[in-house]
Amino acid sequence: MKYFVVALALVAAFVCIAESKPAESEHELAEVEEENELADLEDAVWLEHLADLSDLEEARGFFGNTWKKIKGKSDKIMLKKAVKIMVKKEGISKEEAQAKVDAMSKKQIRLYLLKYYGKKALQKASEKL
């Protein structure tokens, strides 16, 4: 679970970096204005913004695919954890637990895991007190 949180934080950081826009200096804007013979500074900013859009689209595509891969792997890990917990908690065979988990929706599996780990965390906290 810790690795999932770290991976999620890394993906969020990369998305923020990809969507951040570098600061534009007056010198860069003047060059764009001279190249395109623009009289208005706002037009130069607009053209520079259009030039940056293609890079942002490529970055979004990369991070979107990465996010889908991470989400798929986390779903598989949740399924395996739910099966292990059912086997341990209910004392049933692995096949029976797998059948129960397969019948559950992703939302039900998440709730089951949150409930289990919530109780476990509460027990640890009460032991420390």
Swiss-Prot record:
Keywords: Antibiotic, Antimicrobial, Cytolysis, Hemolysis, Secreted, Signal, Toxin. Belongs to the cationic peptide 06 (cytoinsectotoxin) family. GO terms for biological process: defense response to Gram-negative bacterium; defense response to Gram-positive bacterium; killing of cells of another organism. This is M-zodatoxin-Lt8e. Pfam families: Latarcin. The keyword Signal applies. A motif (Processing quadruplet motif) lies at residues 57-60. Expressed by the venom gland. Residues 21-60 form a propeptide. It is found in: Secreted. Its main location: secreted. Residues 1-20 form the signal peptide. Insecticidal, cytolytic and antimicrobial peptide. Forms voltage-dependent, ion-permeable channels in membranes. At high concentration causes cell membrane lysis. GO terms for cellular component: extracellular region. InterPro entries: Latarcin_precursor. One of its GO terms (molecular function) is toxin activity. The lineage of its organism: Eukaryota, Metazoa, Ecdysozoa, Arthropoda, Chelicerata. Both the N-terminus (61-94) and the C-terminus (99-129) of the mature peptide form alpha-helices which probably disrupt target cell membranes. The linker region (95-98) probably derives from a processing quadruplet motif (PQM), found in propeptides of many zodatoxins, hinting at a fusion of two originally separate membrane-active peptides.
